[in-house]
From Swiss-Prot:
UniProt similarity note: Belongs to the NrdR family.
InterPro entries: ATP-cone_dom, NrdR-like_N, RNR_NrdR-like
Keyword Hydrolase in record: no
Molecular-function annotations in GO: ATP binding; DNA binding; zinc ion binding
Family annotation (Pfam families): ATP-cone, Zn_ribbon_NrdR
ZnF bounds (unnamed): 3-34
Gene designation per UniProt: nrdR
Lineage: Bacteria, Pseudomonadati, Pseudomonadota, Alphaproteobacteria, Hyphomicrobiales
Species: Brucella canis (strain ATCC 23365 / NCTC 10854 / RM-666)
Protein name: Transcriptional repressor NrdR
Amino acid sequence: MRCPYCQSEDTQVKDSRPAEDGAVIRRRRVCSVCGGRFTTFERVQLRDLMVVKKSGRRVPFDRDKLTRSIEVALRKRDVDSERVERAISGIVRQLESAGEAEVTSDEIGRLAMDALKGIDDIAYIRFASVYRNFSKAVDFHNVIDELTVSETGDNLET
């Protein structure tokens, strides 16, 4: 594994343990050249997924892009990073175990919103504003109403 600080390939594993309920191996590493310490994660990849964008373009699924999107929504929110990582792993497992070689960007966004709804309301609203392409203040009001209805268990069809 290459050191992220000095790019040396001379690194050693100092600690290795299961994480995320055994779905991931967390390794603590140290660089023999610069002494830098860093953590890596090893996880099973069931299949190579292709994402079908709204434009019809196909690109390889990028777990890191999903992670960055969710982290942007969670910025400055007091949420346990382990909980976020479990949510991201859950989304990826759902996508991989669906048995499809392709998944739409809309499906990924919907799964991310579902996960965020259970983690943090503010992050859910932030993510929704980008995913649903909000253009007016009423769009925010509508998603807040959705959250309020789902939290109280009210049914709009009365």
